[in-house]
Amino acid sequence: AIAVAAGFNPEGGTRNFNFSTRNTHSELCDCISLTRYGYPKDGFFLRAESFYNVASNIDELDEAGGFGPQIKDSYGGRSLHAQSHGESVISLVQNRFGGRGLYLLDEPEAALSPMRLMSLLVAMDGLVKKASQFIICTHSPILMAYPGAEIYQLSDEGIERADYKNTEHYIVTKQFLDNPERMLKYLLEE
């Protein structure tokens, strides 16, 4: 809803993407108003479940041709479909994102291994130091660990601010990694 209210395509991309394969976004976007200080120079909405559609739209626009450079040149010069899902997400962040941007990432961890998540943290840090802002919907304790991150946890009781080590995702992941045998026994034995 935040992405649509900010003017992004519901399926993802920059504000210039206007394709639609299926109208599945929440009507919540009509009920919120955004307040911003200044206007971002750049922006992108990465929605994990429809990033394939964004990559397809880029390829279609490039195949149709135009008067300028190919769109994929802004994404590392290769079709995002010619890369693994994780490689394409990292390529997007490293090549397309720039300073003074607003980047909305919806479950980027769906495509990324733990090592790639750490690469994303490094790339994000460089962009934050160039006055970019990230709003991330994630289940990843690795991404939540970003220094100074404001974390909000959604539950049946509503939305509340949470400390990193008090998030459900951190607690459950730590419990599993601290004693996988015990957790597996609990989960798998009847």
What is each residue range found by the language model?
Residues 115-133, 140-190:
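C-terminal lobe/lid and adjacent interdomain/linker elements of RecA-like ASCE P-loop ATPase modules
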Residues 39-40, 98-99, 131:
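Short, well-ordered loop/turn elements at secondary-structure boundaries
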Residues 109-110:
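Short loop immediately C-terminal to the Walker-B catalytic DE motif
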Residues 1-63:
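ABC ATPase nucleotide-binding domain signature region
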Residues 75, 79, 83-105, 115-127:
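GG-anchored amphipathic helix commonly corresponding to the ABC/SMC/Rad50 NBD signature/C-loop
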